[in-house]
Swiss-Prot record, chain B:
Record's protein name: Tryptophan synthase beta chain
Species annotation: Nitrosomonas eutropha (strain DSM 101675 / C91 / Nm57)
PANTHER family, per database record: TRYPTOPHAN SYNTHASE, TRYPTOPHAN SYNTHASE-RELATED
Subunit field text: Tetramer of two alpha and two beta chains.
Biological pathway: Amino-acid biosynthesis; L-tryptophan biosynthesis; L-tryptophan from chorismate: step 5/5
UniProt xrefs under Pfam families: PALP
Homology family: Belongs to the TrpB family.
Length: 274, 399
């Protein structure tokens, strides 16, 4: 069982939803990222999505775009991100790390070299925003060769035929984008999320995480009542942006603890995965 | 050469093109593919498109023999395909008319566009006014400054211009922002991409609408000169005017096709936009193509005196035509383009856009190496009125 499976299987036995934060590697600087990852695990997260900064983050809103720009000021490269994961792994063997980013830094490194180095660094999954399943056959083969899970996005507009296609390719978990638009937007319809998740579960046999538009404890709890994992990105990145260096770990830690508390307080959990 | 039938069903030109977008955009693109597939074969749609090109755009655009300039250069004869005479002053309108007609049939009431030089923005605002649609144009704030006149033109036409302050504040950032708008408002919104880049079906669809340039040229050359030109020359930013001219000629292998990119301050400096000449393949803005990028795959800011060529990618069909050797790609500096701008003004009484001046500058280099009976057909893709301030500034004059 790999790290991602272990985490979800433990959570299932505890009847809990996973808390997945997103941070951009190198934001605000490379020295902070590994410390921040350890802080996140201490504050109770189950898996970390680590953003690979890119110059043109088309699917992200202004908050995450700015975090990318901050990281790129320090010239953080994909190689640097992998080094951060390796550094994190020296102290932490159990928390899965999923890289999330855009295709071109991986294209520049080459599939083969990337998956080998990612595997060596202790990366557990990779989500490439602009590799939809149609363009992913070779990419997924390379990932699976190295035992890395290909994570895919599903959206409110994904038709059933594509859900089936994603179900065949995806491993680890799938990431349901709970609203139309970019990261950091805010108009989440819980009714929609519930009905869409039950449709997805007809085909998807692995855990389903929900992200985009989750900005407060109450929404996090409501999502936790419906999904297997709650992904929180822009809200955490905002906390990083607005914190002074000296308070950054404490501020993010406090925010994450409150979210953890909220999602563990969920009721009526009706997940029927596995 | 075997029959050229690219792209494939998923929009691939060899290894290039495709649909490299986030899941949230896929269903909108699928819908667009389906609708365009239907209407490209629909006689009534095509009839309306060509009627609009004739009566609204003013097509066909003539081929003009630049005789005095050719004599001065002392070699091949330079012929100009006069896209600058189109309504709104550039080739861009061929495409926006086509896409606006499609948007109407798809029941969309709002169109959005990205623009660099402002020509595509003006062409989009124009058709939005013509067909009674709401129009929002995204433009890098740097370009807003460089192209103040075009910004005002768009506003006069009723469009809302939104300056984009992220990244390098140029065309690529405007494109990112337009994609974001589309993802958010896909229900009532149609995204008019202005060039042959982006995810499938845009590179194919924009090419098809712009192919009127090459199709007319083939007929006009036959009628007026009794033969086809020895070479086609067109500037390449994203590459829509070049593909429009080249595409109908791909099967005619004795016609050379030359795409001219912006060498800016020189391709050995960091300040250029010569994507095919200096770049490496990668993925950006929905397609795999050549990109100007650093060794880590980050996109590098480009530079050109002409905002319309200032883009770090290029249409995937050009990437393919380069790799298979059917087309050649070269680069022209800011200075060479300016010299060609002035030459055309003085020798022919035609003020070319700075974008088109790159193609003219290469023609001026090539012509003297050829015989006097050889013919170079240059796509004069736009007129230069919009560039007046830039040209004056280069001469130390403030208007």
């Amino acid at each position: 069982m790999n790290r991602i499976e272990s985490v979800f299987s433990r959570l299932k036995s505890q009847d809990k939803a996973a808390l997945i934060p997103f941070i951009t590697a190198g934001d605000p600087d490379s020295a902070t990222t590994v410390a921040l990852m350890h802080q996140l695990t201490r504050s109770g997260v189950d898996l970390i999505e680590l953003g690979v900064p890119f110059s043109d983050p088309m699917a992200d809103g202004p908050t995450i775009q700015r975090s990318s720009e901050r990281a790129l000021k320090h010239h953080i490269s994909l190689k640097d991100v992998l080094a951060m994961v390796a550094q994190f792994r020296k102290m932490n063997q159990s928390t899965p790390v999923v890289l999330m980013g855009y295709a071109n830094p991986i294209e520049a490194m080459g599939y083969k070299r990337f998956v080998e180095e990612a595997s060596r660094s202790g990366v557990d999954g990779v989500l490439v925003v602009d590799y939809p399943p149609e363009e992913s056959a070779e990419w997924v083969r390379h990932l699976k060769d190295q035992g890395i899970d290909p994570i895919f996005l599903l959206s409110p507009t994904t038709p059933e035929s594509r859900v089936k296609h994603v179900a065949e390719l995806a491993k680890g978990y799938v990431y349901y984008v709970s609203l139309k638009g970019v990261t950091g937007a805010s108009h989440l319809d819980l009714q929609d999320v519930s009905s869409k998740l039950s449709q997805l579960r007809a085909h998807i046999r692995i855990p389903i995480g929900v992200g985009f538009g989750i900005r407060d404890e109450q929404t996090a709890r409501s999502i936790a009542e419906r999904a297997d994992a709650v992904v929180i990105g822009s809200r955490i990145v905002e906390e990083i942006e607005h914190s002074q260096a000296a308070d950054l770990l404490a501020n993010v830690g406090a925010l994450v603890e409150s979210l953890r508390h909220a999602i563990d307080a969920r009721s009526n959990h009706s997940s029927d995965i596995g | 050469m075997k029959m050229y039938d690219l792209p494939d069903k998923r929009g691939h030109f060899g290894p290039y093109g495709g649909t490299f977008v986030a899941e949230t955009l896929i269903s909108a693109l699928d819908e667009l593919c389906k609708q365009y597939e239907y209407y490209r074969g629909d006689a009534e749609f095509q009839t309306e498109f060509f009627r609009e090109l004739k009566h609204y755009v003013g097509r066909p655009s003539p081929i003009y023999h630049a005789r005095r300039w050719s004599d001065h250069l002392g070699g091949a004869q330079i012929l100009l395909k006069r896209e600058d005479l189109n309504h709104t002053g550039a080739h861009k309108i061929n495409n926006t008319v086509g896409q606006a007609l499609l948007a109407r049939r798809m029941g969309k009431s709002r169109i959005i566009a990205e623009t660099g030089a402002g020509q595509h923005g003006v062409a989009s605002a124009t058709v939005a006014a013509r067909y009674g649609m709401e129009c929002v144009v995204y433009m890098g704030s740097e370009d807003v400054k460089r192209q103040a006149t075009n910004v005002y033109r768009m506003k006069l036409l009723g469009a809302t211009v939104i300056p984009v302050d992220s990244g390098s504040r140029t065309l690529k950032d405007a494109l990112n922002e337009a994609m974001r708008d589309w993802v958010t408002n896909v229900g009532n919104t149609y995204y008019i991409i202005g060039t042959v880049a982006g995810p499938h079906p845009y590179p194919m669809m924009v090419r098809d609408f712009q192919a009127v340039i090459g199709n007319e040229a083939r007929q006009q050359m036959q009628e007026e000169y009794g033969r086809q030109p020895d070479a086609l020359i067109a500037c390449v930013g994203g590459g829509s005017n070049a593909i429009g001219l080249f595409y109908p000629y791909i099967g005619e292998e004795n016609v050379r096709m030359i795409g001219v990119e912006a060498a800016g301050k020189g391709i050995d400096t960091q300040k250029h936009a010569a994507t095919l000449v200096t770049g490496r393949p990668g993925v950006l803005h929905g397609n795999r193509t050549y990109l100007i990028q650093d060794e880590n795959g980050q996109i590098i800011e480009t530079h050109s005196i002409s905002a319309g060529l200032d883009y770090p990618g290029v249409g995937p069909e050009h990437a393919w035509l380069k790799d298979c050797g059917r087309a050649e790609y070269v680069a022209i500096t800011d200075g060479e383009a300016l010299a060609a701008f002035h030459a055309l003004c003085r020798f022919e009484g035609i003020m070319p856009a700075l974008e088109s001046s790159h193609a003219l500058a290469y023609a001026a280099k090539l012509a003297p190496t050829l015989r006097k009976d050889q013919l170079l057909l240059v796509n004069l893709s736009g007129r230069g009125d919009k560039d007046m301030a830039t040209v004056a500034q280069q001469s130390g004059i403030s208007l």
